[in-house]
């Protein structure tokens, strides 16, 4: 079976890397050839959220659109189209319409985020909103033979639109994401890896970190915030740009993972639609973490066994103080988290689910 995977972003984006690219090998072992075609190339993605690069980005979007039109020629050799969120970052779902209506190809839509919630980009504002087609996700859900969903919240929304759904959480290869054998000397490292859009969640607990620093020594390591410098008065901070080659190493450098989510900062449904992937990454590395129990983050792992939940600033402070003062507890929770991920979130099991969904979509279309 030949499957054409259409993604918005290149491999540097977690959605493409972990929802498509990492399945190429496992699907091949199951008799399915997955060809991934991103809309943006790596350079355009790197410049996408830099305001000074707006002219370059607009030109790159035009070039990407023309390149995507060429991908239509591949549809005649394709058994199933697998769309990760959307085939193009702007405009109506033209490519998907051609695939389903003109080429009559079965489509599997993969949603790992609440893209059906209206969202205004802090970088592009009204311009970005004008280029977006916010009914696109609903259209794609209705056209898809199957919708693979990153969590239950997304699945419930897709079902409300009449979709057949399959839940496939975003996972990592636990042979790659492994615990670091020996921790370095020095202060305990609190860690967070994210993007410019999720950085406000971390910023919301800066007052907690400042209070914590008055009584405990630690270092706050921030990766991917989208800012050159991050200053938290009274707190030792290491601020790094995200780098694909360094991703696993960055996670391994943490002693405690932070996973704050504040639904009040964006639309509540947008926060609830987050896949909880960071929790899986923390557990795979074998470290304890503290998470706001929102959306999938409330469902993944076992609170009190693999991690702790915190909603208020007081709860964040209490749990951080507990973990900072008890190395044995950190080790126990981290080991439990590692076991949990290996047993319940293996790449092989998710590859089986995806292969079944692709074959089911193909068979259903042939039967109809």
PLM feature segments, named:
Residues 40-53, 107-137, 186, 263:
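Acceptor-binding helix/loop patch of EC 2.4 sugar-transfer enzymes
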Residues 153, 171:
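Carbohydrate-associated surface elements
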Residues 200, 241-284, 290-301:
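Nucleotide-sugar-dependent
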Residues 303-314, 322-328:
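Conserved acidic donor-binding segment of nucleotide-sugar-dependent glycosyltransferases
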Residues 322, 329-344, 350-353:
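A short, well-ordered alpha-helix in the C-terminal region of glycosyltransferases
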Residues 347-368:
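C-terminal alpha-helical cap of glycosyltransferases
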């Amino acid at each position: 079976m030949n499957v054409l995977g259409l993604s918005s972003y290149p491999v540097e984006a977690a959605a493409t890397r972990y929802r498509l690219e990492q399945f190429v090998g496992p699907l091949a072992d199951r008799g399915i050839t997955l060809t991934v075609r991103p809309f943006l190339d790596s350079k355009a993605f790197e410049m996408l959220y830099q305001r000074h690069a707006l002219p370059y980005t607009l030109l790159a979007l035009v070039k990407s659109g023309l390149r995507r039109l060429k991908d239509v020629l591949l549809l005649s050799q394709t058994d199933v189209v697998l769309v990760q969120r959307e085939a193009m970052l702007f405009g109506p779902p033209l490519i998907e319409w051609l695939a389903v209506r003109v080429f009559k190809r079965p489509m599997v839509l993969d949603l790992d985020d609440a893209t059906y919630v209206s969202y205004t980009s802090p970088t592009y504002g009204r311009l970005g909103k004008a280029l977006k087609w916010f009914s696109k996700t609903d259209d794609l859900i209705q056209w898809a033979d199957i919708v693979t969903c990153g969590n239950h919240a997304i699945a419930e929304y897709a079902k409300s639109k009449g979709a057949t759904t399959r839940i496939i959480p975003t996972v990592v290869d636990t042979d790659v994401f492994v615990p670091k054998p020996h921790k370095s000397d020095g202060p305990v490292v609190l860690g967070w890896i994210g993007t410019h859009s999720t950085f406000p969640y971390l910023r919301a607990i800066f007052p907690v970190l400042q209070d914590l620093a008055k009584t405990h020594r630690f270092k706050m390591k921030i990766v991917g915030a989208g800012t050159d410098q991050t200053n938290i008065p009274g707190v030792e901070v290491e601020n790094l740009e995200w780098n694909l080659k360094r991703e696993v190493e960055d996670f391994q450098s943490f002693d405690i993972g932070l996973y704050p989510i504040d639904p009040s900062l964006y639309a509540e449904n947008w926060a609830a639609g987050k896949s909880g992937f960071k929790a899986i990454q923390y557990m795979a590395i074998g470290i304890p973490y503290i998470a706001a129990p929102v959306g999938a983050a409330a469902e993944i792992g076992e609170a009190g066994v693999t991690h702790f939940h915190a909603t208020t600033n007081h709860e964040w402070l209490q749990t951080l103080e507990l973990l900072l003062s008890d190395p044995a507890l950190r080790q126990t929770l981290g080991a439990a988290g590692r076991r949990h991920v290996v047993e319940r979130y293996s790449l092989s099991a998710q590859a089986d689910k995806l292969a079944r969904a692709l074959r089911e979509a193909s068979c259903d279309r042939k039967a109809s």
